[in-house]
């Protein structure tokens, strides 16, 4: 099949752009010894850096479920304060390498993936620090809507040490 030149050029640009959307930010290491089964279930978003796809959302949760093929189904849900209604997005995640390294790519729209890297996780799998593909994306997650403040402070300090602008964190209402 022969595609017109403009279609090929746009496709190549889109592929090049998306290649930068997956991976681990420089100087950051994903968790090793990761046990995906223990990570499954519901997580509450405690804090995040601002980005358009969650802007104005409160009561945000992420629910993960392991599929038989080793991929992970993702359901993100939150209350849209501007519209006065609940919104949700479902997607899928795949490991970038071996499943004991917490570096994944997640897609909510067709073949377009973004980085999802667990960079801190307590031994009980109760609190997690998630890095996106660059330092513009960061989340603090917890198994409960109101985790201990000491744990949140620890994760914020870790994010700051990794080069994130933690003064820009948005703390999510539940």
Predicted features and spans:
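Bacterial N-terminal signal peptides that target proteins for export
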Residues: 1-10
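A beta-rich soluble binding module of mature secreted/lumenal proteins
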Residues: 2-3, 21-174
